[in-house]
Amino acid sequence: MVAGDQNADPVDGDSRPGAINQLLDNRRVNTSRTPTSAGGPEASRLQGQANESHRSPARYDTADFGDAIGSSGNMRGHVLPSRNLRIEDSGIFWPRQADPLSRLTGVYPFPSSDHRLVWVDVTLPHRR
């Protein structure tokens, strides 16, 4: 399992070209499910600007950075299980503004962080 804030959007990022793809494309990594949120698309629509030029869907965004035209992508955090782990569920904790829990993520200036929690539930393989 690889988890953390890699600050590497595979489509709209400004990190070293192809760096995160080396991990995402590795045969030992289970990428069968990409976590999503309801709040990412809402924030993208409300903020516009750079979000309008991003090629990856906003439902995959894991951070809410500055939206100046030309700024890099918002898929920054990753949770990547090993291929031998079955993904049961996944998501990004980024509720819509109407959700009472949105007070935990909020809008700028954020009450917590500009990064959102990425989570994956997996089933461990049976040990022999």
Model-identified regions with their sequence ranges:
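Metal-dependent phosphoester-hydrolase catalytic domains
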Residues: M1, Q6-R128
